[in-house]
Amino acid sequence: MPKQEWKMEYDSPALVWDDALPLGNGRLGAMVYGHTGIERIQLNEDSLWSSGPMERNNRASLGMLPTIQKKVLEGKMQEAEDLISQYMFAAPYSMPRYECLGELDLALNQHTSFTSSWTPHSLDIDSYKGSLDLMKGVYTLTHSQDGVTYTREMFISYPAQVLCLRLRSDKPGAINLDIQMDRQKYSDQKSLDDRQPGVVKRGGGWAAVLLQENHTVGGNTILIGGETAGIRYASAARVTCDGELLDPYTMLRAQGASEVCIYLAAATSNREKDPKGCLLYTSDAADAL
């Protein structure tokens, strides 16, 4: 099969979650919509659950299994089903819920970026070409506006364990990029639906993992984190650029740049004793490459 047939190409951004393009390395994942004005990238880390490991084995199941098998072979299906309902379910019946990690939000050349009612959207542009190389796992978006061509490249490295994003312009100093991270605090509140940008919905009846930290660190890193039910999690986005990097504490702004790079790492206490320390070390290592 020709190599180009392993590449998915698009002439417009995704409007719903099902159409967004997935990136991942088996542990860290992202869903990319491809908006050119304000972009929201949904993030996942496979060990982020609503609680830690738990023992749910039903200790009575094994002893009752021969009896149930005998009932089935005798054709006594109702009796077998009754025993199954009594002896074969986990204890407790419910299990921890998988939780999304959060979002990485990018606003390119916006006068007002992340207002209280912002939604992901694309600019009035001259050209648009998005692609996902299925063999390399690299997403590329190229668009032109006002005589400037912008190129965004993204992939998630397995060796470095970070999401890597690079935004370039073909004209010097044409990039003014606002970067923030966020996470829905409670799923039972009205909030933006990540699957349908711009749509406000009401979630389920339980709280999501609490976001207790959302601020910059060291003038070049955005950190989010929280703890609930004994599970600690954190994610950090390290930002470098060839322009000026401003630090308003709640976000970072790359101003007058021709190239911006972001390295995003994440960790939880389901896998690491010190998630925050682990991901900051990972960010330092990626930044040094």
Residue locations for each model-derived region?
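Aromatic-residue-lined binding/catalytic grooves and analogous aromatic/hydrophobic interfacial grooves
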Residues: M1-S283
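A short, hydrophobic C-terminal helix/tail in secreted or cell-surface proteins
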Residues: D284-L289
